[in-house]
Amino acid sequence: MEAFSVRFESASSIEERKEQTRNARAEVLRQAKHNFEKEQRGEERKRLRDEDTWMLPDVHERIEQFSQEHSEKKKKKKDKHSKKVKKEKKKKRKKQKCQKQSESTDSSASSEDEWVEAAPSQISDKEKTWKVKDKRTEEECDSHDIQRDEWMTIDFMSIKTVSSSSLKAEKETLRQIEREKTQVLEQSKLLERELNPYWKDGGTGLPSKTCILPVTKAKGVEDGGLSWLRKSCQRMKEQAQKENRNFEDIVAEKYGSMEIFQSKLKEAEKIAYKKEDCGWERWRKPTYSDRAQCSQASGTSDLVKCKNLSEDRHLEMEPANSSNYKFSGPDTGKRSGTLQTCRRESALRKNQDSSGNLRSKFLRPSDEDELSFHKRKNFESSSSYSPLVAQASLHCDFRKLTENSEESSASCSRSDRRQENRKPSDKKPLETWSYNANQHSTGGRREQLQAESMSCDPPGRGLQQDMTLTIAGPEAESTYILNVDEKNKLGAKIIKAEMMGNMELAEQLKAQLKEANKFKETQMPAKRLGVEHEDEQEVILIQTDKSGRMWPVSSPRETLDMKAERRKRKRVSTHEDKERVRYFPDDDHLSLKDLVKNEKIGTDINQNRLFMKMASKFMGKSDEDNYTLDDMFVSKAAEKEHLGKKEESQRRRAIAEHQSLAAKMAKCLYCFDSSQFPKHLIVAIGVKVYLCLPSFQSLTEGHCFIVPLQHHQAATVLDEDVWEEIQMFRKSLVKMFEDKELDCIFLETNMGLKKHYHMVYECIPLPKEVGDMAPIYFKKAIMESDEEWSMNKKLIDLSSKDIRKSVPRGLPYFAVDFGLQGGFAHIIEDQYRFPHYFGKEIIGGMLDLEPRLWRKGIRESFEDQRKKSLQFAQWWKPYDITKSKSS
């Protein structure tokens, strides 16, 4: 036979590969930290240089003027509102007075007929009734009766004063508390998703020394010192590993030689196994306990190698009081059944033992992995048991009681004594198992629930006792959130327990389910705190077409039926008496006005999308000449659509469009609300438009931008007032450069309509000689640009009409104007091949400039930008149209 070649890998190569990954991670972290610190330093430098706050003084005054106008408008609105409220209050008061007067007149009219005795006036003897009191005495009496208000009698010197520093300190404490709350919420979310057990519950990432529970070993009784010798072997092995010595030398120091130690072990094994022989005949089939003895004898023969007995691990959880749950004795009537069940159980335990090792590698780590890590690491792995083994060992515990229970229990107890590492309590092993399961995480609890479900099968007294042991101690058991499957399993166990008559178990399981539900209710609000703090925005959803027209999206008239999605669409009758009555199911509900409105609102994109959807679904169903494409569309149109599906799809599309537009505007370089907007480059602010300078190095001295305040994409979609103000800025710029004996060119490039770029109208000054030759250069470049065979006219003359009247809305274009004269326009056929720097490239060629100036632009420092803006502001001051407007 050919030997199969196995590829081995040395430990040094594995360690080297790990070291490389560690170094790579460290390098990535170092680079990220370096970049972050660099950004922080840059922001700090900007803050120190006032890059974010510095503006031209004229611009600052203009912004303050805008804010004052805005505040005055708000005040006027408030005054109007307050006046309305006052008028309403006056009306209410008048009504109330009228009602009171009417009530008083009614009461006086009714009380005229009644007689009332007057109270006798107590007048002193000195004073006569006919004498009139002096005014002074009346004033004195009034002064004695009137009391001052409480705030007038307060000693203001005793009032505690509040300083600005104390207010700042209080605000800082409140902010600190809010930060701590947010950190706690974030930490709780991270802890829920944490897979490493050593990071959970505030861990350090490394196993703590206290997490290893001290495990006391059960003493073997009447085993001839076998357990003691095994423990001694284990300790000698550990000593040899710690001191890096030979195992045989340590054995020779303690026992004289290895042969003496092996002879003692053999004698102890003989004494231990001699008592297990029950005088059974050789021809009889071996029972479960016999097979356990054989497996143990074969496992202990090679104790020098210190290997654990994997065959005996399924007996570690056997209860010491197994007299209640017995294997059948030597009765011939009951022997065959017990032998078959024991065989099944032993095979099942072996399978679970072998699968448990593999399964543990692919399970999500839980809290109980902390203990299993140390148990697998040391030689004490035999003392640890997995929940699967514990579950398997419980199969033999829950059995019917037999007559010869004592004989079978003796064999089970002897097999338990042979285990070298056991839990401390021999009397209540199930109780210890439930305690460990409660101590650990959800994995142990799920296994406990499985054990409870197994316990519900056979009724009996011993069954109820063990069930109380496994379920006992709900106080010590920490509740956790159950998922849907676990709740279903728990409900099935409750029903099963009620059917078997075990009401105590059913009540306990119900209480457990109730506690889990309560725990879930208390935990869910804490998780939603972060969502509640988020600001909700109320937005009018709009739909925009290519031409820039916008209209609000109508809310669904009928709620979307989710169940109807799964049903087949119903066919609507389209013909009556062999005549076509309708094409679509909603033809009866739509008037001619509605149809015209839908046709105007609908875009070519929607029609193409609908066409592609229908064609892709039914292209395979065409039957050559019998079932053509037209028939397919006609039959599809006759099917009734689901309720509200069309409106819901439009709403979803509008929400996605709004979100993408908001994200683009947040990063826009020319929007006032953007965080990246360079305020120090603004020169003048109008009503709808502002004038600014480029953030990169200018092509020529005086290079500037005319930009609308609102986020518009192109000149073809602008309103009339915005376009008029742009033309006013254009005229003043032309006049300014004419006085300096310069000519100027205005450029606009509208590309990438889906990306929602901000419209920029560039003004580039040129010398007079170059400016006179510019129309020839641009005309030739436009004729040679783009596709050879174009769908639209290549060169559009703008001398008689401006760009808004020459190019339809929604088309990408390039436009150039020469001073106050007209210019040329070109509709872009292929946006991917047409360069965005087309106009600047032509000017760069005319002036013989470096390509890097007009390709991406060279960055400028803040000082250079400030000098540039101050110089341009001096040029612009005599021609500023914003000041003339404001004055």
From Swiss-Prot:
Residues 14-72, 124-143, 342-352, 414-430 have a biased composition (Basic and acidic residues). Pfam families: CwfJ_C_1 (PF04677), CwfJ_C_2 (PF04676). The modification Phosphoserine is found at S71, S354, S366, S478, S622. Keywords: Coiled coil, Isopeptide bond, Phosphoprotein, Ubl conjugation. Residues 433-442 have a biased composition (Polar residues). InterPro entries: Cwf19-like (IPR040194), Cwf19-like_C_dom-1 (IPR006768), Cwf19-like_C_dom-2 (IPR006767), HIT-like_sf (IPR036265). Residues 99-110 have a biased composition (Low complexity). Residues 73-98 have a biased composition (Basic residues). This is CWF19-like protein 2. It comes from Mus musculus (Mouse). The lineage of its organism: Eukaryota, Metazoa, Chordata, Craniata, Vertebrata. The gene is Cwf19l2.
